[in-house]
Amino acid sequence: AWIPTDEGSSLYIRPYVFATEAAIKANPSLEYRFAIICSPVSAYFSSAIAVKIEERFSRAAPGGFGYAKAAGNYAGQFYPTEIAKAEGYQQVVWTDANTHSFIEEAGTMNIFVRLGDKLLTSPTSDTILDGITRKSMLTLCKDLDIEVEERPVSVAELIKGFETGELKELFGVGTAAVVSEINRFGYQGIQYSIDEVENPYAPLLKKTITDIQLGRTEDPYGWRYEII
């Protein structure tokens, strides 16, 4: 009964490590504890979201650990995300710390951009999470004959794609949200609303991966594990 059975809900399993040495000091701890959180969760986002492209604050900087699921990467997001929420957005699209001109992540999710029939996603680096859902999407795209390219995507290219009509979809992917469609983004005070398209990739990818997760289809990749 503790494991949710509603569609979109799940038992979120998250391993973590924290320092336990009985001392307060400016040095790494000599003792740590490993634990696993098992938490029932509902659907992260129930509908498409609006995001703000960040121009001032940064999630991670080169030379850091933005690629990892580390608590410090989340703490720095809280304040700018609250500002974005007060402005009518649900999440922030993070940009590179050096120039704020290249998109990196959407909230706590990796981000995908569809220009024409091609999907683009930023390559992983020390500032971009090496997400397991991102890896899964790249695998599914290959088998679904969806062309995908890993390369930096600038804010200017995103806006140009919107203006020319080449921008078809924008969505984030992650373990909590799975696939979260973005139907509006804001940049420098201007709002850009993305119209629905025929044969969208985001719901197809979400259905494909959730069907595998829920055992509705075969798992040719060996992604499912029985938890006892």
Regions from the PLM with identified roles:
Residues 16-19, 23-228:
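Helix-start/capping segments and mature chain N-termini
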Residues 4-22:
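Short, glycine/charge-rich beta-strand/loop segments that flank catalytic centers
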